[in-house]
C-alpha cells in the first residue's frame, strides 16, 4: 500500500505555487511508478510463490523443520502479493472498494507481512541449530517437525493479534481523493513501532547473531559445501539489507517529523524504497527454495508432468537429472544437516 498516502497533505498544504507544482509532479510520478511496481511484484510473486507451494505440497515430503517453514513462507507472500492489485488501482484512481474491503485488505496485507518476517526469523534460527548443533538436530527431527507446526500456528495467531489496530482503525477517508488507511497519530505510532520491531529489527538481529556463528562454524569446515553455503548466507543478508533497510530508515525519519520530511524529494524516497522493500515477496522463493537441489529436481518433475519439457528443449537435462538420482539419494543424509539442504 502507498505509505505516503496517509501523510501527503501534511508536507504540502502550506507551500507556495512552486511547491504545489512539484507536488503535482510527484503525484503523477507516484500514479505511474507505484502501480507498475505493485503489478511487477504481484506477477513475479504470484508465479514464484505458487510454484513453491505446489512443489512443496505435491512433490516434496515434509522431512525437516525448514520444509514446514517453506510451506508457510510462500503462502504468506502469496496472499500478501494478491492484495497489491487493489492498492495499484487505488494508487492510479482512488479507493472504490468500500470500508469493509478496506479493513479486510489492510488486515490481510498486515497479517501476511508479519507472518513472512517472523517465518524468515524462524528459518534463520533453524539453520543455526541445524549447522551448529548438527547431530542433536538430526536426532530430534520428528520432535522438531511437531514443534514447527505449532510455531507456524503461533506465528499466524501473533500476526493476527498485532494486526488488529490496522483492522479496527482502518477506514476510508478523503485527502483530495478517497484513501484506505488509518489517519490517527497514536495508531500510526503503534503500527510503526510494531512494524519496525517484528518486521525489521527482530529478523535483522536473528540474522546477525545466527549467521555470524554459522559462518564461524563453516569456516572450520571444508570443501565445496562450505563455500556454497557461505555464498548463500551473504546473498540472503545482502538482499535483506538492501531491500528492507532503506524503507525502514525512511519510516524512522518520517516518524521524527524532521523538516526534511516536508521536502518533495523525501516523498519520492518513500515510494521508491517502499517498492524496493516489496521485492522480498519475489525474491524469497529464489533465496529459500530454488537454491535447494531437491527443490530444483522436483521443479523439473513438475515441468515434465505438465508436458512442457519438449517445448523448453530440456529433455536432455531432465534425462541427465534422472541419471544422477542415485548420487542425489546417496548424499541425502549429508544434506539433511547442511546449511540449506542444497
Swiss-Prot record:
Keyword Glycoprotein: yes
InterPro entries: CCR1-9-like, Chemokine_CXCR6, Chemokine_rcpt, GPCR_Rhodpsn, GPCR_Rhodpsn_7TM
Keywords, sorted A to Z: Cell membrane, Disulfide bond, G-protein coupled receptor, Glycoprotein, Membrane, Receptor, Transducer, Transmembrane, Transmembrane helix
An annotated GO BP: positive regulation of cytosolic calcium ion concentration
Transmembrane segments: 33-59, 69-89, 104-125, 144-164, 188-215, 232-259, 276-293
Disulfide cysteine pairs (residue numbers): 102-180
Residue ranges that the UniProt entry lists as topological domain Cytoplasmic: 60-68, 126-143, 216-231, 294-342
Record topological domains on the Extracellular side: 1-32, 90-103, 165-187, 260-275
Main localization of the protein described in the UniProt heading: membrane
Subcellular location: Cell membrane
CDD domains cross-referenced by the UniProt entry: 7tmA_CXCR6
Membrane topology classification: Multi-pass membrane protein
Keyword Nucleus annotated: no
GO CC list: external side of plasma membrane
Glycosylation sites per record: 16
Pfam families given in the database record: 7tm_1
MF terms in GO: C-C chemokine binding; C-C chemokine receptor activity; C-X-C chemokine receptor activity; coreceptor activity
Homology family: Belongs to the G-protein coupled receptor 1 family.
Physiological role: Receptor for the C-X-C chemokine CXCL16. Used as a coreceptor by SIVs and by strains of HIV-2 and m-tropic HIV-1.
Name of the protein this chain belongs to: C-X-C chemokine receptor type 6
Species of the source: Chlorocebus aethiops (Green monkey)
Taxonomic lineage from the root: Eukaryota, Metazoa, Chordata, Craniata, Vertebrata
Gene this protein is translated from: CXCR6
Amino acid at each position: 500500500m502507498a505509505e505516503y498516502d496517509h501523510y501527503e497533505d501534511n508536507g504540502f498544504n502550506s507551500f507556495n505555487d512552486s511547491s504545489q507544482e512539484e507536488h503535482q509532479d510527484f503525484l503523477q510520478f507516484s500514479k505511474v511508478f507505484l502501480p507498475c511496481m505493485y503489478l511487477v511484484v504481484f506477477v513475479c510473486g504470484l508465479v514464484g510463490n505458487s510454484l513453491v507451494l505446489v512443489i512443496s505440497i505435491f512433490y516434496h515430503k515434509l522431512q525437516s523443520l525448514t520444509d514446514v517453514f517453506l510451506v508457510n513462507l510462500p503462502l504468506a507472500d502469496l496472499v500478501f502479493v494478491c492484495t497489491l492489485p487493489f492498492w495499484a488501482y487505488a494508487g492510479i484512481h482512488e479507493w472504490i472498494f468500500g470500508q469493509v474491503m478496506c479493513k479486510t485488505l489492510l488486515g490481510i496485507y498486515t497479517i501476511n507481512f508479519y507472518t513472512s518476517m517472523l517465518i524468515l526469523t524462524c528459518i534463520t534460527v533453524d539453520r543455526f541449530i541445524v549447522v551448529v548443533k548438527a547431530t542433536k538436530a538430526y536426532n530430534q527431527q520428528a520432535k522438531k517437525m511437531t514443534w514447527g507446526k505449532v510455531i507456524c500456528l503461533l506465528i499466524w495467531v501473533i500476526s493476527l493479534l498485532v494486526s488488529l489496530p490496522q483492522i479496527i482503525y482502518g477506514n476510508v477517508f478523503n485527502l483530495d481523493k478517497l484513501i484506505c488507511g488509518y489517519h490517527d497519530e497514536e495508531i500510526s505510532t503503534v503500527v510503526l513501532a510494531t512494524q519496525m520491531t517484528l518486521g525489521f529489527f527482530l529478523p535483522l538481529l536473528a540474522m546477525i547473531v545466527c549467521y555470524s556463528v554459522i559462518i564461524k562454524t563453516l569456516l572450520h569446515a571444508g570443501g565445496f559445501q562450505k563455500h556454497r553455503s557461505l555464498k548463500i548466507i551473504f546473498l540472503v543478508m545482502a538482499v535483506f539489507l538492501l531491500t528492507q533497510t532503506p524503507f525502514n530508515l525512511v519510516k524512522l525519519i518520517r516518524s521524527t517529523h524532521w523538516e526534511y520530511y516536508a521536502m518533495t524529494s523525501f516523498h519520492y524516497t518513500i515510494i521508491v524504497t517502499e517498492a524496493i522493500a516489496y521485492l522480498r515477496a519475489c525474491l524469497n522463493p529464489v533465496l529459500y527454495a530454488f537454491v535447494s537441489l531437491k527443490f530444483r529436481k522436483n521443479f523439473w518433475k513438475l515441468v515434465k508432468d505438465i508436458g512442457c519439457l519438449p517445448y523448453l528443449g530440456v529433455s536432455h537435462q531432465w534425462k541427465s537429472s534422472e541419471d544422477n538420482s542415485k548420487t542425489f539419494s546417496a548424499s541425502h543424509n549429508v544434506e539433511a544437516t547442511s546449511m540449506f539442504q542444497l
